[in-house]
C-alpha cells in the first residue's frame, strides 16, 4: 500500500516538474527578443531582403529647424521605403491622426509624438532633397511594442516587416532612377 502511494506521488511530482519546465520555456521564449536591441532586430529583417533592395542607414536630411537622420531608406524598383523605428516597450494606443500617442507598460505611462507624423517629416525632407517626384513609401517599425489600435498599413511590428515589403511588388522605378537616388542620398 505504501509503495502505491509513493509511486503515485512521484508521478504527480514528475508531472508538476515537467509542467513547470514547460511554463518557464514558454515565458522565456516570449522575451528573447527583448534582449536584442530594436535597431538590431530591424537590421536583421532588412538584411533578409533580396538584391532588388538597397538599404541605406542613417541618411542625413535637412528639416525646417535643423538636421536629422532617417534610420533606414530602402531603395528598390518598387519605390523608396522610408523606414522609421519606434523602440518603445509596452502597449501603444492612440488615434492614427492624433499628435500624441500613449505608451503603457511596466508601470510607466508616457506620451510620445506620433511616429507616423515624424516619418512624414522625413518624407517631406527627402522630397526636397531628391527634387523629383518619386514614390516614397512610409513605414514605421515597432520593435518591442504591441499596437493596441489600428494605425494603418504603414505601422508594422518588426515581425511583419518582410510581409510589408512583399506587398509592394509593382515596379515604379527604373535602375537609372534608383542609382540617381542612391547617389544623392549618399552625399
What do the PLM-derived regions correspond to, one by one?
Residues 1-69, 74-80, 86-94, 100-187:
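Surface-exposed interaction regions that form or flank ligand-binding interfaces
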